[in-house]
Every structure is written in structure tokens, then in C-alpha cells.
């Protein structure tokens, strides 16, 4: 993958999640909305696919075996930082874990469990090149004062 990546395919996305049931759900929902969907069970497989395809959006789970979402984000930041703006992190990790994530360079964050319409709307906005609307897409609980 080079730092000057080719233009992305407007409706092509990749879902990176180790849960086969969630991958199947994402395929069904996103294909119904006109997206072409590829899937990867971990960060290593995802990087291989990302290096060969120009995705409009990358849905990324953080907690996976082998190469996790944090490790994939680090590799993308080193090798092709422009792709980070196409990443939508989806996670059920604790707030403490999520707080270690730098959300300034990614498109957004969605907490699991999530509303499927919220996810589809986020993927559509990201793939259309629309900037995220602050605060990032999230169902995270408010901090206690």
C-alpha cells in the first residue's frame, strides 16, 4: 500500500470483526443499502484486503484475536494515515479501553450494542465523504461529574 492511494470505490466497504454472526448481519444490512461488502475476521486479514482495495469505509472492531483493531489502526497510521478518516470503530470495550483510542483521526466511534440504522447512516455518511458531526457517532455513556 502506498501513501498515495487510488481513489476509493464509493460504495465498497470492509467489515473487520471476529464475530461471524455480526459479519453476516453487516453484509445483509449494508448490501440491502447498495454497498459492496467485504469482511475480515481480524486485523491481519483486513490489512491484506485494505492493501488491495480502496474502501470508502472501514468498520473496525477493536477486540479481536491475532491482530486486533488497535494494532491495525497503528499500522494504518504509520503506512497510510489518510485511510484513518474512513475508519468507523465499533466496540463493546469498556469506557477505560475506549479512552485509550485517539478518535481525532478516525471518522467515528459506535458503541456496541448499537442501532443498525445508526451504523448504516454512519457508513453512508463516511462513504459519501461527509465529515463526522461532532461529537463522533457514539452511544457511549456520559461521564459522571
What are these regions (language model features)?
Residues 34-41, 49:
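Short hydrophobic/Thr-rich beta-strand motif most characteristic of the beta2 strand and flanking loop
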Residues 61:
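Active-site residues of response regulator receiver
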Residues 112:
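A Lys-centered signature of the CheY-like receiver
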Residues 90-91:
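Hydrophobic/aromatic residues positioned on beta-strands within the core alpha/beta folds
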Residues 41-45, 68-72:
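Acidic catalytic/metal-coordinating carboxylates
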Residues 1-14, 117-145:
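Non-catalytic signal-transmission and effector/linker regions of two-component phosphorelay proteins
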Residues 24-32:
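Charged docking surfaces used in two-component/phosphorelay signaling
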Residues 64:
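Receiver (REC) domain active-site loop signature in two-component systems and cognate sites
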Amino acid at each position: 500500500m502506498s501513501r498515495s492511494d487510488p481513489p476509493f470505490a464509493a460504495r465498497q466497504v470492509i467489515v473487520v470483526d471476529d464475530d461471524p454472526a455480526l459479519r453476516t448481519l453487516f453484509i445483509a444490512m449494508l448490501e440491502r443499502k447498495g454497498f459492496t461488502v467485504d469482511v475480515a475476521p481480524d486485523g491481519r486479514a483486513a490489512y491484506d484486503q485494505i492493501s488491495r482495495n480502496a474502501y470508502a469505509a472501514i468498520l473496525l472492531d477493536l477486540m479481536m484475536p491475532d491482530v486486533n483493531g488497535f494494532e491495525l489502526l497503528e499500522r494504518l497510521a504509520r503506512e497510510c494515515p489518510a485511510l484513518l478518516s474512513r475508519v468507523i470503530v465499533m466496540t463493546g470495550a469498556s469506557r477505560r479501553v475506549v479512552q485509550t483510542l485517539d478518535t481525532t483521526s478516525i471518522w467515528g466511534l459506535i458503541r456496541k450494542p448499537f442501532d443498525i440504522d445508526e451504523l448504516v447512516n454512519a457508513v453512508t455518511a463516511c462513504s459519501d465523504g461527509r465529515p463526522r458531526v461532532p461529537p463522533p457517532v457514539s452511544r457511549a455513556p456520559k461521564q459522571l461529574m
